[in-house]
Amino acid sequence: MSLAEDIALVARQESALVFEHFDENTAWQLGSRLRQMAVERGYPLVIDVRRFGQVLFTAALPGAVPDQAEWVRRKTNVVARFHRSSYAIGLELAEKQSSLEEKQGLPTVDFATHGGCFPIRVKSAGIIGCVTVSGLPQRADHELVVEAICALTGLDYATYKLPQA
């Protein structure tokens, strides 16, 4: 799978994974779904669901370390700024052999273009927040979020799943 193909597939995920509505209860369902998936699979994750400016769900699972919360913050900053998944931004920069620091002057201490943060898009409202996980390799972080959003929105994950790298 080429970078260009991955970029196109992630863009397809971003445009298709849309919630009809999103409130505190939806955030709880999404965060709880991610937590359940992580527990069942033995993943040591930090999970964060937020509207921009307001945390709605957060959890740290056994084996997670404090640095993962810092990764959540840095990935969230990317999605809040660009309204794209952190993985999409990272893939596009990799294709151009560049970085956010080089292209935008954004410091890596505050911005991480690694997979795992995905915009929360609501029909008729646009992007209102993001969901982030940290603790797995970046592609796996990204895919776990996509799988959970598919489950909540009734979409078939197999249709949107990225192929194994």
Curated annotation (Swiss-Prot):
InterPro entries, alphabetized: PduO/GlcC-like, PduO/GlcC-like_sf, YBR137W-like
Gene3D superfamilies for this protein: Haem-degrading domain
Taxonomic superkingdom: Bacteria
SUPFAM superfamilies, alphabetized: GlcG-like (SSF143744)
HAMAP family on file: UPF0303 (MF_00761)
NCBIfam families to which the protein is assigned, alphabetical: PRK02487.1-5
Family (UniProt): Belongs to the UPF0303 family.
Protein name, per record: UPF0303 protein ACP_1015
Originating species: Acidobacterium capsulatum (strain ATCC 51196 / DSM 11244 / BCRC 80197 / JCM 7670 / NBRC 15755 / NCIMB 13165 / 161)
